[in-house]
Amino acid sequence: MTPQQREEAAQSLYQAMQSGKPIAPLRDTFPDMNVDDAYAIQSINTQRRISLGRRVVGRKIGLTSVVVQQQLGVDEPDFGALFDDMSFGDAETIPLSILHQPKVEAEIGFVLGRDLDTEQPTHQEVLQAVDYVVPALEIVGSRIADWNIKFVDTVADNASSGVYVLGSTPISPRGLDLSLVGMCLSRRGEPVSTGAGAACLGTPLNAVVWLARTMSRLGKPLRAGELILSGALGPMVAVKPGDVFECHINGVGSVRTEFESNQMNGVAA
């Protein structure tokens, strides 16, 4: 892709985000698009948001679950930026007007207590850098019509980011085997998605290690205070107006969210 084409792709995604009207897959509009192009497009819109006063508070890792990879037809993780205005409190109601074809994923949030700026951080170094973990719900969204995405589409679209909710009781990850934690996501008390830490690259810690190494290689190391969302521990679930979701992760805790009952982007009440 030419620099102008990258700008055009970024603008089309941004307009879709603002209008709530999804667009055709970028891979169809720009057949020569590759992964480097996709991350460049993501970066253009990240800088656009920063210029408008938004602040990057961390990173999200996507496509870490084999189940989710199968759902979307991809075979490797990706990452996107988390902004300060994406955060909602535990049990807070989320307005539907800001969402784009939303789906819920149960994850683990890692908050760093120190920088991870070595070139190839080890698992132990990453674990020691984590201040605490919390259960998290990520409400992913797509600006691509009907979630018709391949890897380059979701990467360009900030890893299909939306908003997120963190649990209110932080705990230390040291002494926890995060590969063994079980997860149950319920809609109004009925289980709709189950999984375990092992579904996330073998353990959510592996996902954070992957991200730390990737960001160091890109010259953008993870910093103290940043939030890292691990990626899904089980299948994602489509949101309906008025839904109430609660996630429980054994040994980590619970987190809850609910959605407005009126119409939202891409879904009719």
UniProtKB/Swiss-Prot annotation:
Q: Which Gene3D superfamilies match?
A: Fumarylacetoacetase-like, C-terminal domain
Please name the top-level EC class of this enzyme.
Answer: lyase
From the record, give the transmembrane residue ranges: none
Spell out the InterPro entries in the cross-references.
Fumarylacetoacetase-like_C, Fumarylacetoacetase_C_sf, Hydratase-Decarb/MhpD_sf, Keto_pentenoate-hydratase
Which Pfam family is one of this chain's hits? FAA_hydrolase
What are the entry keywords? Aromatic hydrocarbons catabolism, Lyase
Write out the catalysed reaction: (S)-4-hydroxy-2-oxopentanoate = (2Z)-2-hydroxypenta-2,4-dienoate + H2O
What is one GO cellular-component annotation here?
A: cytoplasm
One annotated GO molecular function is:
manganese ion binding
Listed pathway(s): Aromatic compound metabolism; 3-phenylpropanoate degradation
Swiss-Prot/TrEMBL cofactor(s): a divalent metal cation
The EC designation for this entry is 4.2.1.80
Which GO BP annotation is one of this protein's? 3-phenylpropionate catabolic process
Q: Which family does it belong to?
A: Belongs to the hydratase/decarboxylase family. MhpD subfamily.
The job of this chain, per UniProt, is described as:
Catalyzes the conversion of 2-hydroxypentadienoic acid (enolic form of 2-oxopent-4-enoate) to 4-hydroxy-2-ketopentanoic acid.
Spell out the PANTHER family in the cross-references.
Answer: 2-KETO-4-PENTENOATE HYDRATASE (PTHR30143:SF0), ACID HYDRATASE (PTHR30143)
Q: What is this protein called?
A: 2-keto-4-pentenoate hydratase
Lineage summary: Bacteria, Pseudomonadati, Pseudomonadota, Betaproteobacteria, Burkholderiales
Q: Which gene encodes it?
A: mhpD
